[in-house]
Amino acid sequence: MRVLGLDLGTKTLGVAVSDELGWTAQGIETISIDEERGEYGLKRLREIIDEYEVDTIVVGFPKNMNGTVGPRAEASQRFAKLLESEFSLPVILWDERLSTMAAERMLITADVSRKKRKQVIDKMAAVVILQSYLDSKQ
């Protein structure tokens, strides 16, 4: 049983997957997408879901700091519905407030260059989101 964690942006989709026991999240990759065109990398997601035998998907849900739902959170809701329809798997929207900032902080602490951070930040945000979800289940 593995869980897939996703961090949706307008141009990229950060992807992480849990270990088989559901204890730890590992970053897999960042998929290039085009939200305006409705291109979400579903073919690649299908390959990842099949390869890792995923049974649940967790999508970052970026609420505003006051708990309200803004445009990015609405985009995540639409994306979650698309995933449920496409893959027939349970999709959980997970509060991801500050996940990108936490990922950025970890990369800075690890002395990762700005250029490299830009390349991996979405994947790391997906790891933060998924790990938060997994920790809540322990």
UniProtKB/Swiss-Prot annotation:
Organism: Geobacillus sp. (strain WCH70)
SUPFAM superfamilies named among the record's database cross-references: Ribonuclease H-like
GO cellular component: cytosol
Function: Could be a nuclease involved in processing of the 5'-end of pre-16S rRNA.
Record keyword Calcium present: no
Keyword Hydrolase: yes
Enzyme Commission code(s) on record: 3.1.-.-
InterPro entries: RNaseH-like_sf, YqgF, YqgF/RNaseH-like_dom, YqgF/RNaseH-like_dom_sf
Family affiliation: Belongs to the YqgF nuclease family.
Keywords: Cytoplasm, Hydrolase, Nuclease, Ribosome biogenesis
Name of one Pfam family that matches: RuvX
Entry's Gene Ontology BP terms: rRNA 5'-end processing
NCBIfam families linked to this entry: RNAse_H_YqgF
Protein name stated in the entry: Putative pre-16S rRNA nuclease
Top EC group: hydrolase
Record localization: Cytoplasm
Superkingdom assignment: Bacteria
Recorded GO MF terms: nuclease activity
